[in-house]
């Protein structure tokens, strides 16, 4: 049982004036199914994750540094000041390609645009 369902059940049980048991059951079942559907709709979809793990997976897929956005080489050391291109790629890593594509918040003809377009093609090919 989800914690929100337990909260709803407690509210129905301790309501004043007291509700009949069959009405409590009816209300709880109706609310439980609609809340479950809403929770499923709000779950993260593929390529839209915002957790640190999702960001690290994106950085690894792009072969970019998670901290500075630069290409990963054998002797990579993060620089103190990153270029605009690397910071754009870093925003794709941290915010996700689907969000930036929907908002149009990326520079044309940049590395970030290429990363976003490649991921959008991948999403379309997987039919997500």
UniProtKB/Swiss-Prot annotation:
Keywords: DNA-binding, Metal-binding, Zinc, Zinc-finger. One of its GO terms (molecular function) is zinc ion binding. A zinc finger (C4-type) spans 65-94. Pfam families: Viral_NABP. The keyword Transport does not apply. Signal peptide: none annotated. InterPro entries: Viral_NABP. May act as a regulatory factor during viral transcription. This is 14.7 kDa protein.
